[in-house]
C-alpha cells in the first residue's frame, strides 16, 4: 500500500512517472536472479524462504530485498526470508505483512530491524546451515 501511496503522491506533485520507473530499473542479470529466487522459494509455516546459490553476486542485497518483497504477494505467505552469501558469511533479508514479527526471528539469529522488515548476518556458515538456523528461529 505504501508504494501505491508514494506513487500517487509523486504523480500529484508532477513527477514524471517514466523517470521514476527508470530510477527503479535493474539489470537483466539482477532481474533474472530475483525471478530465480522467487521461483525456488519454499513455504514453511506460512513463511516463504529462498536461499541464493550465488555468493557475493552483484547487487545481491538489493535483489534479495526485492525478492523478499515479491514473495509477500503469494497467497498464504505471511512472511518471507531471503538467505544469501555475502562477504564470506550468510545474510538474511526478512519481510512481513504484519502477522509475523520478523524482527524477533532475526534477533534470534543475532540481527534486528522492525516488525515488518529485518535482517541478520552470520559469519562462517554456508547456505544449508543458514537455512537450518532460520527454520529453528521460525519454530
Kindly give the residue locations of the regions a language model identified.
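Hydrophobic helix-and-loop "lid/oligomerization" segment in the mid-to-C-terminal part
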Residues: 1-139
Amino acid at each position: 500500500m505504501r508504494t501505491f501511496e508514494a506513487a500517487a503522491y509523486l504523480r500529484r506533485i508532477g513527477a514524471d512517472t517514466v523517470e521514476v520507473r527508470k530510477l527503479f530499473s535493474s539489470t537483466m542479470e539482477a532481474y533474472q536472479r530475483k525471478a530465480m529466487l522467487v521461483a525456488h522459494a519454499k513455504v514453511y509455516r506460512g513463511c516463504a524462504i529462498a536461499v541464493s546459490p550465488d555468493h557475493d553476486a552483484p547487487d545481491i542485497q538489493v535483489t534479495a530485498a526485492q525478492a523478499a518483497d515479491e514473495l509477500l504477494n503469494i497467497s498464504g505467505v505471511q512472511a518471507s526470508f531471503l538467505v544469501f552469501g555475502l562477504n564470506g558469511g550468510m545474510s538474511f533479508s526478512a519481510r512481513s505483512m504484519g502477522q509475523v514479527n520478523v524482527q524477533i526471528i532475526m534477533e534470534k539469529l543475532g540481527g534486528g530491524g522492525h516488525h515488518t522488515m529485518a535482517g541478520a548476518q552470520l559469519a562462517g556458515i554456508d547456505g544449508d546451515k543458514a537455512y537450518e538456523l532460520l527454520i529453528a528461529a521460525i519454530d
